């Protein structure tokens, strides 16, 4: 909704309900550390006030409330048909200030333009946890555990024209956060920010590309076959500043106790080759992904 003010200003309200299910298919998981089944249900509302920033950017002040529900198994050794899930849920409030400049030509698989994005957030809320009754764990439910943290995320994504046939894209992304770990390893990974630079990475779950603090970068050589068709090779590297790791107690192997690893101690990368047909109303792609962890 655009407001009748001297400076162009708009008010944007969003209400979203999301229900995600990650099945037992191993195509979605790359190590047995992550449970074979995860369900995430999210209900959140956002209110944003936007206005121009400098000449070609916009700024937004936002407030949000969300109820996040995670249902998961902490081990794959439990017979799945008889299993019930651990349940973590969160009531979170946040305030944010963001600045964005975006001239990318498309939302998916862009080949020209530039995006610069910076957001600062303050988040506060509570965590509650109920263990699965079939997990044989000695864990007790936890009451309201308060979490508060500051988070800063920056992203630079730009595509340059090298010739009539070739473009080159590059990406840099960084997240800095004071966020604490959750009750257990799986809950901590589920609630950590994820690096999802491709459409495919947005619909699968991979713990190797989740961390509360990380740096990531990428290169995208692009061959333009026609005005609507192009071939691209997207290559990305991901380095958690402090990787989320887990310790398994001997007296209760079901539970993973989370802790932070050493500074910049791990590095993962992913690659995707894709042929993309970009229509005015639809994007069609045929791709092959490679992930190394």
Pin down the residues of each PLM region.
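Gram-negative/organellar outer-membrane beta-barrel architecture
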Residues: 1-104, 108, 190-199, 204-215, ...
């Amino acid at each position: 909704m655009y407001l009748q003010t001297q400076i162009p200003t708009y008010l944007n309200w969003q209400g979203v309900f999301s229900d995600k299910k990650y099945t037992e298919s191993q195509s979605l998981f790359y190590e047995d550390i992550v449970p074979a089944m995860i369900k995430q249900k999210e209900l959140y509302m956002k209110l944003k006030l936007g206005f121009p920033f400098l000449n070609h950017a916009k700024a937004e002040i936002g407030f949000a409330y969300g109820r996040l529900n995670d249902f998961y198994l902490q081990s794959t050794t439990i017979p799945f048909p008889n299993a019930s899930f651990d349940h973590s849920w969160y009531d979170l409030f946040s305030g944010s200030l963001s600045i964005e400049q975006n001239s990318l030509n498309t939302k998916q698989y862009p080949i020209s333009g530039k995006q610069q994005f910076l957001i600062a957030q303050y988040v506060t809320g509570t965590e509650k946890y109920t263990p699965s009754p079939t997990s044989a764990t000695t864990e007790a439910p936890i009451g309201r555990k308060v979490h508060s943290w500051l988070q800063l995320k920056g992203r630079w994504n730009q595509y340059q024209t090298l010739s009539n046939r070739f473009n080159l894209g590059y990406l840099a992304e960084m997240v800095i956060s004071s966020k604490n770990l959750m009750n257990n390893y799986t809950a901590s990974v589920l609630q950590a920010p994820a690096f999802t630079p491709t459409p495919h990475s947005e619909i699968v779950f991979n713990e190797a590309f989740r961390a509360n603090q990380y740096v990531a970068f990428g290169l995208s050589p692009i061959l333009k076959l026609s005005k609507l068709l192009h071939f691209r090779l997207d290559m990305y590297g991901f380095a958690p500043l402090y990787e989320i790791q887990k310790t398994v107690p001997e007296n209760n192997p079901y539970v993973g106790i989370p802790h932070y690893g050493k500074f910049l101690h791990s590095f993962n990368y992913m690659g995707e080759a894709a042929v993309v047909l970009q229509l005015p109303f639809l994007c069609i792609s045929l791709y092959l992904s490679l992930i190394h962890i």
